[in-house]
């Protein structure tokens, strides 16, 4: 049985992603480019740490009036799902990445964004709705070291 894909595009061009995956083009490029190590070897504790960080940032940015309450609640709901291990298969990256952890950060952003879209009744790839909100939740490497 052939695997089905969806095609997403961004500033780097088009990329084929497994049809029902919650990740997006940045994660898929990392999968394609870092064929070293065991797939999905990113420790759950790191994924959970990012979920806690993004949940906290969503709450803070709502309090600062930078993020509307509806979007904050969507981000919180998805982060809680991640913390309950409901989406472990959506974090396929290996631990071998560039030093800043950008790939893992983008993987989390894409999963939160796409899952939030589904929860709000939008299409899987209509990620502009939530993606802009996640800009407020992206740490620089100095913030997590």
Please place each PLM-identified region on the residue numbering.
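Helix-loop-helix junctions within predominantly alpha-helical proteins
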Residues: 107, 120, 125-130
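Single conserved hydrophobic/aromatic residue that forms the stacking wall/gate
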Residues: 136-145
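Active-site catalytic microenvironments for nucleophilic, acid-base chemistry
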Residues: 63, 115, 119, 140
